[in-house]
From Swiss-Prot:
One of its GO terms (biological process) is cytoplasmic translational termination. PANTHER family: MITOCHONDRIAL RIBOSOME RECYCLING FACTOR PSEUDO 1 (PTHR20982:SF3), RIBOSOME RECYCLING FACTOR (PTHR20982). Disulfide bonds: none annotated. It comes from the Bacteria. This is Ribosome-recycling factor. GO terms for cellular component: cytosol. Belongs to the RRF family. It is found in: Cytoplasm. Its main location: cytoplasm. Responsible for the release of ribosomes from messenger RNA at the termination of protein biosynthesis. May increase the efficiency of translation by recycling ribosomes from one round of translation to another. It comes from Klebsiella pneumoniae (strain 342). InterPro entries: Ribosome_recyc_fac (IPR002661), Ribosome_recyc_fac_dom (IPR023584), RRF_sf (IPR036191). One of its GO terms (molecular function) is ribosomal large subunit binding.
Amino acid sequence: MISDIRKDAEIRMEKCVEAFKNQISKIRTGRASPSLLDGIVVEYYGTPTPLRQLASVTVEDSRTLKINVFDRSMSAAVEKAIMASDLGLNPSSAGSDIRVPLPPLTEERRKDLTKIVRGEAEQARVAVRNVRRDANDKVKALLKEKEISEDDDRRSQDDVQKMTDAAIKKVDAALADKEAELMQF
C-alpha cells in the first residue's frame, strides 16, 4: 500500500519536473532551437494544425531556423502563423524554404524572460508540493483506518519529503541552467 503511494508520488513528481523542463525549452534564448516553434499552430484548410505536421524545422546556424514546408501552397500561411505568434520573429521565404532569423535578445527582454522562467519554476515547485500533500493525505487515511502504524506513517512522510526535495532540486537545477543560457550574450 505505502509502496504504491510512494511509487505513484515519485512518478507524478517526475512528470512535474519533465513538464517544467519542456515548458522552459520553448522559451527563446539567443540560440536557435526547433522546439522554439512547437507552439505554432497554422490554419490548414480551415483546421488548426501544429507546424510540426506541416513542415520540418531544422537549425541552419546558431541564429537561424530553416522550415521546409511539405505543401508549398502552405508557405504563406506558415509565415503568417509565425508572425502572429508572440515570439517576435520575422520569417522570410526562399523558394520552398522559410528562414527564420532570431534577433539577438535585448537586456530588458532577457530579464523579462528570466522572470517568466522563475514563475514557471515556482509553479513546478507548487505542483511537486501538491503531489507530496496528496501522498501524505493518502498515508494519513491509511493510518486513520488503522491499516498502518504511526512508525510507517512517519517513515512514509520522510521518504516522500526526500523525493520532494530531490524533485525541487531538479527544478532548481533546470532553472539555473536556463537563467545562465538566457544571460549569455
